Amino acid sequence: METFNHIDIKKYTREDLLYLRNTNNVLFKMFQKQVDEIACLSSKEQKLCGTLTSINNIINENYTIYCLIHTDGLIGFIKIGEKNLYLYDKIKLHYGKCTCVLDFYILEKFQKRGLGIKIFNFMLKDNDISAFCLCYDNPSYKLQNFLKKYFSPCVLIKQPNHFVIFSNYFKNVSIKKVYERISN
């Protein structure tokens, strides 16, 4: 098994990307191209027609992207952001602003080397949040297995909106973030 030294994790917010675009457009375009390439692979893995991630999407929607960077360039990312979602807990319908994992992909050559959990834990720590408090946008089979492997025991609950939550999501999310509404 090949070891990969010199792997960094970098966080880019909307403000970071706007600053990069305004101060070093050449570097911005190169980064944009790398994100687009990995986003295409992520979409292909999920059997989607279009891509979920682009620099413009991150800027326009005020999302955050965490990037795994190797000496050769970008090798993977996690995109997170807040979304207003309706979620069911089998009894009640909840509505609120939820922190979501919107896209997660690592180049195949770099998978199964502990880099996924490394970037995932970095993102969790940076946001002071638990994996059980996140919503996952239409996670691929690989992402579901990743969650089961590292956050076991877990039961993932599919929502009608294609998001997935952990079965104990409502026990972990503060009432300030999710408001209850009686479902009819």
Curated annotation (Swiss-Prot):
Q: What Gene Ontology cellular component terms go with this record?
A: microtubule
Q: Does the keyword Metal-binding apply?
A: no
Entry EC no(s): 2.3.1.108
Query: Got any disulfides in this one, which pairs?
Result: none
Catalytic activity of the protein: L-lysyl-[alpha-tubulin] + acetyl-CoA = N(6)-acetyl-L-lysyl-[alpha-tubulin] + CoA + H(+)
Residue ranges constituting the N-acetyltransferase domain according to the UniProt record: 1-170
GO MF terms, alphabetically ordered = tubulin N-acetyltransferase activity
Keywords of this protein's UniProt record, alphabetized? Acyltransferase, Transferase
Gene3D superfamilies (UniProt xref): 3.40.630.30
Annotated site (Crucial for catalytic activity), which positions?
Answer: 46
Top EC class, one word:
transferase
Residues given in the record as acetyl-CoA binding sites: 104-117, 140-149
Instruction: List this protein's GO terms for biological process.
Output: regulation of microtubule cytoskeleton organization
Which family does this protein fall into? Belongs to the acetyltransferase ATAT1 family.
What HAMAP family does UniProt report for this protein, alphabetically?
A: mec17 (MF_03130)
Q: What does this protein do?
A: Specifically acetylates 'Lys-40' in alpha-tubulin on the lumenal side of microtubules. Promotes microtubule destabilization and accelerates microtubule dynamics; this activity may be independent of acetylation activity. Acetylates alpha-tubulin with a slow enzymatic rate, due to a catalytic site that is not optimized for acetyl transfer. Enters the microtubule through each end and diffuses quickly throughout the lumen of microtubules.
The identity of this protein, by name, is Alpha-tubulin N-acetyltransferase
**Organism encoding this protein:** Plasmodium falciparum (isolate 3D7)
